[in-house]
Amino acid sequence: MAEATPEKKIANAMKAMDDGDFKKAYTAFKKLAAEIPDNAEVWYYKAECGNYASGMFGAKVDTQEIMDAYKKAIELDGERVDYYQSYGLFCISVNKYDEAEKAYCEAAEMDESMSASLYSEFAIEYYNNVMATYGEIMEDPKARAPYGKKALEYMLKALDMTPEEAKSLL
């Protein structure tokens, strides 16, 4: 029997992903990334499946390997806002906040029609993750302030509003 074509392998990996079998899909996309290394979607789905498999299903997928797969997808197809957004969200989930901020800002610059959504998503996800990760700072307003300030800066960007305008409304 002839070996499946790359298209068929991608379809099978997508089916596993659609069925919620992220471990199986991750394994398939990992193999596909080695077979067709110039396919941005394969790298993106490798990253996404690695993220879901490790996050929700406890698979042992290295954080750096997931980050590298997102970066490779972006390198191969740097016009996909969703690649930057997903990468940024993943970086937040692993407490790589500077990298996340950079990814969200690049995505917002690429597609101004989505900038408000991207900035507000970064602000909320960033703040929620910091509060969940460093719960003890919630009790101390001074410790919480720098994180709240950064989140607020991005919310104001999303609203296209200066701090002065916001103060006048409050």
Region roles according to the model:
Residues 4-38, 48-61:
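Alpha-helical segment of the N-proximal tetratricopeptide repeat
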Residues 14, 48, 55, 89, ...:
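Residue-level recognition of tetratricopeptide repeat
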Residues 37, 78, 112-113, 160-164:
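Short coil turns that delineate tetratricopeptide repeat
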